[in-house]
């Protein structure tokens, strides 16, 4: 089934009005994307809190209409519905159903991280390399955005876990994923040989997503999820926290206390330029602190002092 697609730019403040107008004139679907994606101004949208729908400052809004819709009449109807909005920057084009589906799926291709780790959407066949006997494959819903491996902070943490496995530091260990989101990091650790993973997040939605992904990957028996206030007090040989720099600063003492003596920690969700203060913040507890960069994002790793 073909469609007529209207694409335009808007701000977070005007997005509800644009979307309301589009739906009123018969849009079949409306998709929101970061207008600054793949640029230095790209914004990370982390797992939302309950009842929250965080958006980017500037968005690309794409609406699909039936193929026989008249673009000029649609534009006139939109201008009549909300004449205060600027509709002049919108552009129309005809798209085939298979083109739309392919464009969506192309955003979520199988991805490899390091020597063994693969993140593969459910709708894709396993690449040949991911079928190797020692491949660590995590299957995720392609509808996931942040926490699907596509963001540099997630990729930095996945590569770190992969290297721990290569170095023999992950097998049979317990792993804490603090700020687990979709559970992608904890699941990767399990697939790489960890014995057990604990996922902690302050968002109940994230815990549901993590538990669901664990079950779909056959890891429900080894994955346990908790709200922060319910997390058992324990230490772990491996701790990973992919959250915001401000949270990493505020939680430094707590996270340090969760790492066993000689254990490893990885911190991400850190923009380039923020790593200096965090390196100093964690220095009282960790040796061999290192910062690794991927584009505009950083990862800090260290070894817990005995």
UniProtKB/Swiss-Prot annotation:
PANTHER family: ELECTRON TRANSFER FLAVOPROTEIN BETA SUBUNIT LYSINE METHYLTRANSFERASE
Keyword Chaperone tagged: no
Encoding gene per record: prmA
Binding site for S-adenosyl-L-methionine: 154, 179, 201, 242
Molecular function (Gene Ontology), one example: protein-lysine N-methyltransferase activity
Entry's family note: Belongs to the methyltransferase superfamily. PrmA family.
Major localization class: cytoplasm
Reactions it catalyzes: L-lysyl-[protein] + 3 S-adenosyl-L-methionine = N(6),N(6),N(6)-trimethyl-L-lysyl-[protein] + 3 S-adenosyl-L-homocysteine + 3 H(+)
Highest rank taxon of the organism: Bacteria
Localization in the cell: Cytoplasm
Source organism of the structure: Stenotrophomonas maltophilia (strain R551-3)
BP terms from Gene Ontology: methylation
Protein name: Ribosomal protein L11 methyltransferase
Keywords recorded for this protein, A-Z: Cytoplasm, Methyltransferase, S-adenosyl-L-methionine, Transferase
InterPro entries: Ribosomal_L11_MeTrfase_PrmA, Ribosomal_PrmA_MeTrfase, SAM-dependent_MTases_sf
Function: Methylates ribosomal protein L11.
Enzyme Commission numbers on file: 2.1.1.-
NCBIfam families: prmA
GO cellular component terms attached to this protein's record: cytosol
One Pfam family of this chain: PrmA
Broad EC category: transferase
């Amino acid at each position: 089934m073909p469609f007529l697609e209207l694409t335009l730019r808007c701000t977070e403040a005007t997005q509800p009005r644009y979307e309301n107008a589009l739906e009123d004139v018969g849009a079949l679907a409306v998709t929101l994307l970061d207008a600054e994606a793949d640029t230095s101004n790209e914004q990370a949208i982390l797992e939302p809190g309950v009842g929250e729908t965080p958006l980017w400052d500037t968005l690309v809004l794409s609406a699909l209409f039936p193929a026989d819709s008249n673009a000029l009449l649609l534009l006139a109807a939109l201008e009549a519905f909300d004449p205060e909005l600027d509709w002049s920057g919108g552009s129309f084009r005809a798209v085939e159903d298979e083109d739309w589906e392919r464009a969506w799926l192309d955003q979520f291709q199988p991805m490899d991280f390091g020597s063994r780790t693969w993140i593969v959407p459910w709708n894709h066949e396993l690449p040949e390399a991911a079928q190797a006997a020692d491949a660590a494959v995590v299957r995720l819903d392609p509808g996931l955005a942040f926490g699907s491996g596509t963001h540099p902070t997630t990729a930095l943490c996945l590569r770190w876990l992969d290297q721990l496995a290569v170095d023999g530091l992950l097998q049979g260990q317990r792993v804490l994923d603090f700020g687990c989101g979709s559970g992608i990091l904890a699941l990767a650790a399990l697939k790489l040989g960890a014995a057990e993973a604990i996922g902690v997040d302050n968002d109940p939605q994230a815990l549901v997503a993590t538990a669901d992904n664990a079950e779909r990957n056959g890891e429900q028996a080894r994955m346990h999820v908790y709200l922060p206030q319910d997390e058992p007090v324990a230490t772990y040989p491996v701790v990973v926290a992919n959250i915001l720099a401000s949270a990493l600063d505020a939680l430094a003492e707590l996270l340090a206390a969760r790492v066993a003596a000689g254990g490893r920690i990885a911190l991400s969700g850190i923009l380039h330029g923020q790593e200096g203060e965090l390196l100093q913040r964690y220095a009282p507890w960790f040796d061999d602190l290192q910062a690794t960069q991927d584009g505009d994002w950083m990862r800090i790793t260290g070894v817990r002092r005995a």
